[in-house]
Amino acid sequence: MDTLQQSPPAEPEGGLRRNLKKRHLLMMSLGGTIGTGLFIGIAEPLSSVGPAGTLLAYLFAGTIMLATMMCLGELSCAFPHSGSFQHYALMFMPSPCWSYTIGWLYWFSWVFSLAADLTAAGFIAHQFFPAVPVYMFCLAILLILTAINLTSAKSFGECEYWLSAIKVFAIVLFICAGGVMIYSLMGHSDWHPTLKTDGMWFPHGWEQIVVCMTIVIYSFQGVELVGNAAGETESPHIILPKVILGIGLRIILFYGLAIAVLALVYPHELTPNGQSPFVWVFSHAGIPGADTLMTLVIFSAAVSAANSAIYASSRMLWSMAGDCFAPACFGKTNGGGVPVYAILITALLALVSLLTRYIPAQQFYLYLIASTGQVGCLAWITIGWCQYRFRQSVRNGTYASDLLRYRSPLFPWTARFVIITNFAIMVGTWFSKQGVVIMLVELAFMIGILLSWYLFRPTLSRLRNTVG
């Protein structure tokens, strides 16, 4: 760019409407990361790295998440857009190829995440109604959530607000119940709380913490949904700076306290069998019906995560259509201001969750979350890189300084921290169970998307020139 860039238009283009409010964004951000990755996925780290390793892994992942939020907040305050980092990659990456690639990778990852969350919800519902197969529950939940998202962004926001409120309340209740349980055990038994396992801090070696970070980081991924929602939020320049730091600190607090309780009372030697460690704690806390209540909370968490997945993936596809990286039909909206065809194609591909008819639900779920975790790391790397390039562009005068409505602290170290740590987590995947297979599958996806870019580049370039 040769000329000084001024502030972007206040209203979104393409038919989307700014009808999400501050309370939607607050609860969406907070509840969006409290999902199946925490309630169910935590069983694997507890088993593989022990209580101390699990606590360290989640605190470290939370720090990465907070740094990413700060970088994304700076970009979203300057350029509120429902395409979030995919659109920012088009602005700040040297080639549009990466914007195209990360956009499609991220969309596919949300589709798989949607399938994982549907699988988790279906698996839980199946426990209450064993006569109904898991895949039938998956289909029913998908149809209901698709109908909600087709109505309006406000309908999505209201649904997500109350589902997230349930999760937040449950976490607070769990921390209180766990605290009482620890206190009673200390006073009436020979048990003493410790984070050690057989006298060791890390029973399988500290390097296992790096290996399990793919599953751990998945628990926090979804917080970047704030960037997508910024394009449909009232007064994003005012709201976002107020929520970013507070949301990040609250998430770390909730995760830290909840996992500390789990690390102290949950037997790490238990083999993950599909039951949430949270349910195990409640069932041993002596509260009548608490384990059943927690199971229902986890069900709502899975439904909430699936709801967010439909929203995020459809907005990403809408953004790519606007950038001429996807068919134009995905950019069309209905009277409620939602991208109809983007939502429908997302729901259609999420029917992969019906494979639970042939694959055990727990095994299928773990495979899906490990796969999506890698793309999430790439997305966070993109956010860090774009924020770094944006701040450099402001310094050299390419962009006006008044765009810095929110400044990410400790520049450039925050962005560098985000990039380096996420890259290290991706490397660690190679040493995890089935890590090589997961990486090869994702590499095949990336190569396929890159090949499609070079195959369709002449057509895409003509479309972009015509629109521009």
Indicate where each model-derived feature is located:
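Membrane-interface "cap" regions at the ends of multi-pass membrane proteins
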Residues: 1-43, 47-52, 66, 70, ...
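Helix-loop-helix connectors at the membrane interface of multi-pass transporters/channels
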Residues: 3, 86-97, 118-138, 170-173, ...
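Helix-loop-helix junctions that connect adjacent transmembrane segments
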Residues: 9-16, 55, 130-133, 164-295
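Hydrophobic transmembrane alpha-helices that form the core helical bundles
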Residues: 44, 57, 66-150, 155, ...
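TM-loop-TM module centered on a large, flexible mid-protein loop between adjacent transmembrane helices
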Residues: 87-95, 127, 243-309, 326-372
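Membrane-interface loop-to-helix entry segments
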Residues: 122, 135-190, 221, 244-248, ...
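C-terminal membrane-solvent junction of multi-pass transporters and transport-like membrane proteins
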Residues: 162-163, 329-340, 380-433, 463-468
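A generic transmembrane alpha-helix motif of multi-pass inner-membrane proteins
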Residues: 177, 181-182, 363-367, 371-379, ...
